[in-house]
Amino acid sequence: MEQGSILIVGVGGIGCKWSGGAHDKCQQLAELLMIDADESSFTSEHEAHCLHLDASGSARGAAALPNLAAHRLNEGIANISSLLETSELVILLTALGGGTGSGATAEIAAKSRDSGSLVISIVGIPFAEQPLRCAIAEKALPPIERNSDLCIRVSLERLAWQARHRNSDWKLGSEWIGELIEGLVTTLGRVGKINLDLMDLRTVVGRPGNATLIVGNGTTDDPDGVVKMARNSPLSEISVDGAKGCLIQVEGGPDMTLGHLNRVSEAFVSTLDNDCQVILGARASEDMAGRLRLVAVVSGL
């Protein structure tokens, strides 16, 4: 894919943090757009297109008011229309339960699909002990799912649990969000030994049923650990067992062998449906020396 045809979009405060961290890992392969009612989300450390949903400068915010955020987005959508229209793949990142992410994400997804883009939404689901945020998220999720080709739910509770084990900040995605996006973008944006492209992705996510995107990282000494990590991704409770479609990319360094590729891919697909359509890709790069990464989109769940 050509540079600029992949767009990473952060919506709301958490979404902007996630998108900034993710874009840092693949700046040469994707554009970055940040959308929020709080201007402090737009930090100078990231090269990003920004849409401020409080153009009056009154610092009104949109906390717990999704309809207000949607209204303000529609007022400013013309400012980002050309960016959406030139993107083949739009990756939306947000956390539901507040105003901006809950109100604006579905609108961005719909506008992107109307422009012909493939839309992947990654949405954070609130902690169970936040009943108001959970109620807002429950109402916001269906239109996001309807307007996305693939909608991935991320449990903030599981993300926070993993962050503690990694000594990282869940609000920054506990590193997992960045790894997930980097894996997907490099899978589609760089030439590999066995190439995957957007049509392969469309084929997989077009299957009936639910779909999800997962990533696992490890070393060439422990390919089984890569698969185990992928299966323990901090999503909502979801099993890939019996999946009907799978796009899988295995990445490694110059030391990655055909044995590594077979070990990782065969271990991952072993629990999928016997008739699962599997599309396999592989890529080697100097910066992955000694390491392996598995990126998989599974569908028909």
Q: At which residue positions do the language-model features occur?
A:
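Tubulin/FtsZ superfamily GTPase core signature
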Residues: M1-L301
